[in-house]
């Protein structure tokens, strides 16, 4: 068994200061041992440096001298490390390596590791004391101004205007009291660009005439002041003070502050404070007087005219608010105002601000409502809704309004026009249920036929087609330009009429194709038996008041024999010439030829005298028909392709040869264009 014995030889040698000496590695010139650490502390007299020479180097080589090496250490810092086999760079000199230090102390350390594969002899070196020039050989100059060297020492001196401090190294100077009044000038630290004096406080004053501000400009390279300590405090500093503003303190290599300082003041104080240490060159600045400027952006949400990079004393600007904002002064609002740059650097009218435009409380609409907004300023969104289920909004996207820049509530589709709530047509709250086929129909509720209108004197009917218009037969109103009408009733008793909603006529418009009767003979021509009654006031829709739809013009609205429709009214029944309560019936469509074959009850009229045209519908069956008193009422049919009960007026009760058989109805589909055109031409400004 092999045992590896490791030992370490740690030694340190020092002696009294000498002017020269020799250093040899252990066992030199024999091979040095393993695992050795040995150091030599070299010291020469004060005021001298050390010159170290190596005449032999034979140490185990390794990368970065990591295994065996000789180190040269000065002030705790490694100045060199040698290993390997070195030879002289010059054939006439024994010197292999040399080091020179301006300090009087030096340490040499030799280290070997635990394993040496070959035999190495180590190193040989010697040193000598050399004179040091403290004024030039050291990084830190010992004197703040003049350094005077002699063998073994130095002394400091100052320029004539300076004095030497008690530390015999630093010079001080008195540098306060200067006042600068010119509009342009230059100021620098004492002795610039040479090192400024230590332990000094320099105060300068710049005083310009009113209306000008002091503007200081610096170049970074013109500033070299002792930097801040680890806590951020400046031992030497430059500070500016103007009114209630302070700039600085500043220190460091290169000016750390803004290169241009606009003080907004016509006076500026400058203080330069130094401590007992430092060898920096100081600073130099330039200043000039600039007309007092005012900040460019004094208001938000606005544009300035003229738009300039800089505004100065007495400049006037027009400030215009951006879209959606306005200026309010008392009860007056505007989109712009004027402001003047004042001598103190503040704008006149600085209290005015561009604030969001106020659109006010949204206007109400008829038959609808608007949500109450939290505020009514620019950008606020509100929504209008209609009173369902009796009204719907005319435009699907017409409910949302936004407070616009012009102070109006605006809809993307309608602009500033308010939305309109249109009555829902053709939808009864209680659809009519047919129980049996009887002459004169069966009792009905107004909720079955909410479009039913009663005409008094003579008794007749009409159909409400919107809030302002009633559709009826021409023969009902041809001799009455102001008919008496009621809506929302079923019974015709006097008390019922007094409580019903009276409809007042604005105008009666009879179709131009209707021929006037001569009153001498029974009427036999009912072609174009249709008229419109315009109301003075709109009808408020609800369970008892609701219009019936107009027919479409497509083929889907063509009627065929056998199609069933509803009629309603207060006409003659099998037992009574007229009835008190509203009745309804379901009636089938038949061919026009059927109506031609009905025997006339009036013996004075011949069947061939009656005019039958394509503007008419024939409907009815034995025992189920409209009769006198039902004239002008609606012949209602289910709207095509709609599952829920919804009705349109296909016909108007017009005439018949006798009751209880077949009747003739005005075909409304043929008159839709005339109806719409007439209503449009006679619709004045809405009251809603």
Swiss-Prot record:
Enzyme class: hydrolase
Binding site for Ca(2+) 2: 131-132, 134, 149-150, 153
Assembly behavior: Core component of the complement C1 complex, a calcium-dependent complex composed of 1 molecule of the C1Q subcomplex, 2 molecules of C1R and 2 molecules of C1S. The C1Q subcomplex is composed 18 subunits: 3 chains of C1QA, C1QB, and C1QC trimerize to form 6 collagen-like triple helices connected to six globular ligand-recognition modules.
Taxonomic path: Eukaryota, Metazoa, Chordata, Craniata, Vertebrata
Family: Belongs to the peptidase S1 family.
Main location: secreted
A single BP term in Gene Ontology: complement activation, classical pathway
Site-annotated residues for Cleavage: 437-438
GO MF entry, a single one: serine-type endopeptidase activity
InterPro entries: CUB_dom, EGF-like_Ca-bd_dom, EGF_Ca-bd_CS, Pept_S1A_C1r/C1S/mannan-bd, Peptidase_S1_PA, Peptidase_S1_PA_chymotrypsin, Peptidase_S1A, Sperma_CUB_dom_sf
Distribution of this protein across tissues and organs: Specifically expressed in male reproductive tissues.
Annotated EC: 3.4.21.42
Keywords noted in UniProt: Calcium, Complement pathway, Disulfide bond, EGF-like domain, Glycoprotein, Hydrolase, Hydroxylation, Immunity, Innate immunity, Metal-binding, Protease, Repeat, Secreted, Serine protease, Signal, Sushi
Sushi domain: residues covered: 292-356, 357-423
Pfam families per record: CUB, FXa_inhibition, Sushi, Trypsin
Active site: 475 (charge relay system), 529 (charge relay system), 631 (charge relay system)
Disulfide bonds: 65-83, 135-147, 143-156, 158-171, 175-202, 234-251, 294-341, 321-354, 359-403, 386-421, 425-549, 595-618, 627-659
Residues glycosylated per entry: 174
Binding-site residues, Ca(2+) 1: 60, 68, 113
Any single Gene Ontology cellular-component annotation: extracellular region
SMART domains (UniProt xref): CCP (SM00032), CUB (SM00042), EGF_CA (SM00179), Tryp_SPc (SM00020)
SUPFAM superfamilies reported for this sequence: Complement control module/SCR domain, EGF/Laminin, Spermadhesin, CUB domain, Trypsin-like serine proteases
Top-level taxon of origin: Eukaryota
Name of the protein in its database record: Complement C1s-1 subcomponent
